[in-house]
Amino acid sequence: MSRRRRNAYSSYYGSRGGSRGLADWFGLLALLCMLVCSVILLVRVLGAGVLTTALTVVLILVLVLLNGLHAFVQLPVRRNVAGKLICAVVALVLSAAMIFTSTAAGSLMKFLSNITSGGSAKTTTCVVVRADDPAETVNDTFGYTYGILETLDRENTDAALSHIEDGMGQVKTAGFGTLTQLADALLNRQVDAVILNNSYFSVLKGTEGYQSFSKDTKVIYRFSIDKADPEPIAPNANISREPFVVYCSGTDERVDYIPLNSRSDTNILAVVNPSTHQILLVSTPRDYYLPLPSYGQKDKLTHFGLYGIEESIKGLEQLYNVDVNYYARVHFAGLVGVIDALGGIDVNSDVAFNTVGMEVPDEDGSGNFHFAAYSFQKGVNHLDGRQALAFARERDAFDDGDMQRGRNQMLVVQGIVNKAASPAILKSYQDVLAAASDSIATNMPKEDIISLVKMQLQDMSGWNITTYGLAGENSADYCYSLGNDARYAVVRPNEQMVATAQDLIQQVLRGETPTVNP
């Protein structure tokens, strides 16, 4: 054998005296890489706590077996170069898979920590002037007369007013009894500026005659108060066996956080029985005319959220005679990113319709909005995020308006669940989790969510999802949040449908399959 061939032989196989060649060292490095990745994976998964005891034991055994087999091949000085190289490549592939899984586990835990924060109890109060007013800052309003609400939201109004007066002295004010009176006073030049809770802009936008209030005015100052977060709920050790009820609330506020004290445009009770794998979704029209639990006066259900998410929960508890255990608050605009990250969703519409022009987020992610109209066919529609947002918002195209919108919103929820449960999510799970982190807030403890994930991994059974949307009679009446100046569009509850919903809820809680009696 020539010297050159002997040197090449020794490089790959090692010398006859037992030194290692390149193939040996490559194999050992691959083994070390897989060993480190195995430890990281095990630490991440055990830290997440999402696996059952049986699955944890299986994972440990698999990791020990894989590392043991590769050590058996790579540790001895052998001349089987092909075997060492093949095992080394396999080890690197497995290491990459472990890194992917470890990253996914870390992203999942970060996501759970973010969404279980409960949302923000922050309240933002604005100083508003007419659009043609020369004032650009609050200091420019020296000498202005400020309009304020006499009773509604008085605590936040007084806090903002006190803050303003600390900077420029006493402010002259004029009180008004209702929100529409306050808006009229500003637009008709009875006052120069008004102090208005940020949540009331959406109320005025949805009130006939005031839809253009935001365009006719401008905000020159914002004052925020960070109120104490709601008391955390203790984890429920029996969450995977006992039924529970979640209030799913959707908000369309244009803020960079998930508010707990704003209108709720979607009101769905999710009744979940883990033992029977039954889920019942009960949708209540946003304009349902109900008594406010804390005030005794009647208002639209959507306005209940202005007084805090607990007010909405109490109202639905009274309506359906059931205890609500948790809430999940969803920011509609943020769901655009979730659906786009999923690659779109499929919804099966029972009607064909065209939406009116509505504001949707710009595609460049700038946070700005533009008007757009969409068309949907009867049957299956594949929707991107903006189309899904329009599909879930539209109500003017239907004779039964808000009731059909509620049904469409449940279709979007089902579409998201179906797509999220498919293998397609693996390609973009990080984008989905990142978008969802900014769009969802719940007071369900992280430990309870993990317990439910464990339960699902243990039996892998499917879930039976039943939906029920309530309807009512379109009418007009006074609303507490708007005052007694005029009657506003409301939906009077259909008592028979309310009774049916109550019965369906109790069926699920009793462990039965929900069935609507004819």
Positions of the model-derived regions?
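Hydrophobic alpha-helical transmembrane segments in integral membrane proteins
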Residues: I99-S117
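Cytoplasmic membrane-interface regions of multi-pass membrane proteins
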Residues: A71-V81
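Membrane-embedded alpha-helical segments of integral membrane proteins
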Residues: L22-V73
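Intrinsically disordered, low-complexity sequence elements enriched in Ser/Thr/Gly/Pro
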Residues: M1-R4, A82, D384, F391
